[in-house]
Every structure is written in structure tokens, then in C-alpha cells.
Amino acid sequence: GKKKRLALTALYAFCREVDDIVDDCKEKNIGKNKLDEWRLEIERLFNQAPQHPVAIALSPHITSCKFDKKHFIEIIDGMEMDLNCNRYNDLKKFKLYCYRAASAVGLLSANIFGYTNKSTLKYAHDLGIALQITNIIRDIAEDSERGRIYIPLELLKKYNISEDDVLHNKNNEQIALLIDELTKLAKNYYQSAINQLPDEDKDTQKPGLIMGNIYFILLQKIMKSNTGNTLDNRVSLSTYKKLMIAITTSLGKKWIR
């Protein structure tokens, strides 16, 4: 209903606000200060004294959606990881980034959609990580143009790939093998998410499920096109295909298996 729409719009506006700080800030310390201001604003929001228009828009939903303050802080922490633009040494740090960048939003969204079974939160957590890994794989070339590498350095090492290879689109056979491993990791998270979504919450969680299915099909398309020059061709799905996935998901089709 209308309440859910308003809550989602406010949550989306919050994500845009903090995301724009990272995208627009040329100077790290200015960005950090702005993110710190948002940390304070979240404290005010949960003390019923919001000042920022976006926080004011979130305010009526704090209690009704049972929002957890820590998830908002974790989203900001994820943005700060992005702002520092450092590399992620290992899979543990990489997964932490994915959790903050996507699972925290997913958990807040799951609260908006509504659930009766706690397992739904495990589904939202794993789906968030799956979506973020898919995003990272799809955007490797685009990110490298901005000097960003999200792939854990331990994986680059495992496949004998240098940062320079990623930044300048070299050593493609090895990169294809690495992408293969990352797609398998994402696929595992999609499957784990679906396995943890209880039947009784499938209806209310449908918006997230549709998104999960669209990204899962995108991941499969990436796997099919991963032949060695993956960094050259950014994979996407047509609007028609997305619509078809959305409709069939609503009718109960299982895409993730």
C-alpha cells in the first residue's frame, strides 16, 4: 500500500544521499565529514528529532517498519569503505563490503515489505550479497576506469593477475577464470537466499524476489559471455526480459535453482 511506498521512497532517498556524497566528493576528508554528519542525523532520527528532510521522511516508518538503527549506520560504513577507495585484501573484507553496500539495505527493505518468519532476514542478507557480487562482476571494466578494484587481492594473486591487468584490460584468460569463481560464489548466495525464504513470506517479499531473479538471469548471461574479453562487453538485460521475469516471478516461477 501507500505506506510501504512512502517508506521505500524515503529509504531510497537516504541511500541516494549517502551514495552521492561518495560520488561527488573529490576530497576524502570532506566526504568523511559529510558521512559523519549523517551518522549524527541517524542518531537524531532514532531519538525522534530528525532535521534533514530525508530523515524527516523516514521518521514515521521507524516504529511501524521496526527499523534497526545499526543497518543505517552499516550503509554509511559501506559508503566510507567506498570513499577510502582502498582495495580489499581478502574475501572476508570483500563480503563485509557487500554486506554493508547491499545486505543492510535489503534487511531494511525486508522490514518494509513485512515478514512473519525470522528466516526471511537470512534470505535478505544472502540475497544482498549475491546482488552486490553480481554488480561488481558486471562493472569490473567501468570501475577499473575509475581506478577502483573491488575484487579481493587474494583472488587476483590466486590467478596470477596484477592490478595493472585489471586496470588496463590485460591477461584476459586469467581474468575469465577469476570471474568464473566469483560468479559461482554469487550463485551460491542466490541459492542460499532462496532456500531460506519461508513459504509464508514469499508473497510479501515478492519485490525483492523479482529483483533477485532479474540479477540471477543477468549473472547467467555473464557466465555465458565470459570467454576472455569480459572486460570489453558490459552485459545487460532488455526491458522486455526484465518484465517477463517480473511477471513469471509473480506467477510463482522459480528462476534460481
Language-model features: locations:
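Catalytic cores of Mg2+-dependent Asp-rich isoprenoid enzymes
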Residues: 1-132, 137, 141-257
